[in-house]
Amino acid sequence: GYMSSNCLFQSPEVFKMAVAVAPVTNWRFYDNIYTERYMGLPADNGDGYDADSPLSHVDGLDGKYPLIHGTGDDNVHVQNSMRMVEALIQADKDFQWFAYPDKNHGIFGGNTRMHLYRMMTGFIAENL
């Protein structure tokens, strides 16, 4: 989700659509042990954190973009997608938003995964 968002937002001449499932939208919201290993401390590399954040590039969205997240995600917290939703609304961008209640990062259980795959497959088939 992180990479598909950044590709779509930063290279709209190349990418016409992307699906984002549980994206990291700001590395400040992610696991600091993992993030700081590669990016250093936010206090020391604030510009790097901002430059790598899809939130900093929403103005570039010109394609189709469904944003999907499980509200019980304990890996990439749903806060990431909530901030993305707000940034896209404030940038007056069209997008689709879908939340899976109480589902974790893997988005599974019952018919959940099949629903997700069917939704993504239909979106891709309609927009390629």
Task: Give residue spans per PLM region.
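Active-site-proximal cap/loop segments of hydrolase catalytic domains
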Residues: G1-L128
